[in-house]
A protein has these predicted regions:
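Intrinsic-disorder/low-complexity, polar/charged segments enriched in Ser/Thr/Lys/Arg/Asp/Glu/Gln
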Residues: 1-5, 55-57
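Short Lys/Arg-enriched alpha/beta "domain-start" segment
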Residues: 3-24
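Residue-level recognition of well-ordered beta-strand positions that form the cores
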Residues: 7-9, 59-61, 97
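Short secondary-structure junctions
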Residues: 25-32
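Regulatory modules associated with amino-acid/nitrogen control
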Residues: 27, 73-74, 107
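Short, intrinsically disordered low-complexity segments
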Residues: 33-65
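Structural preference for solvent-exposed beta-strand-turn elements
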Residues: 34, 93-108
């Protein structure tokens, strides 16, 4: 399994994080604690959402490189649908990482 992390930070105002949170409410959520939830997204699967004051972190698992690319496209599309940008990076900064460890909440 390939762990994928997308960290979303605002370039301007933190209000864009609230817009993303609102957009994600259309998906099925299971609240884990004050800052973490599991979200089910079609074509992606389970996503661990960690909600911070200045960022939102989305973590998912891919079975192979093709699925990794699909997850990256789907998450990017959802962020773009929530916060359309005329110039990429003008409102949000997206940072992709591929950690070595699988988050505990995504292990089965």
């Amino acid at each position: 399994m390939i762990p994928i992390t997308l960290t979303v930070r605002p370039s301007e105002s933190r209000r864009w994080l609230a817009v993303i949170r609102q957009h994600f409410r259309r998906f099925e959520f299971t609240r884990l604690d004050d800052t973490e939830s599991l979200m089910w997204m079609p074509r992606v699967g389970t996503v661990l959402v960690t909600d911070g004051l200045n960022e939102i972190r989305l973590q998912a698992l891919a079975s192979d490189n093709t699925k990794t690319e699909l997850i990256m496209v789907e998450l990017s599309n959802e962020i773009s649908a929530a916060v359309p940008e005329i110039v990429p990076g003008s409102r949000l900064r997206l940072q992709w990482t591929f950690p070595r460890c699988i988050p505990a909440h995504l292990r089965s």
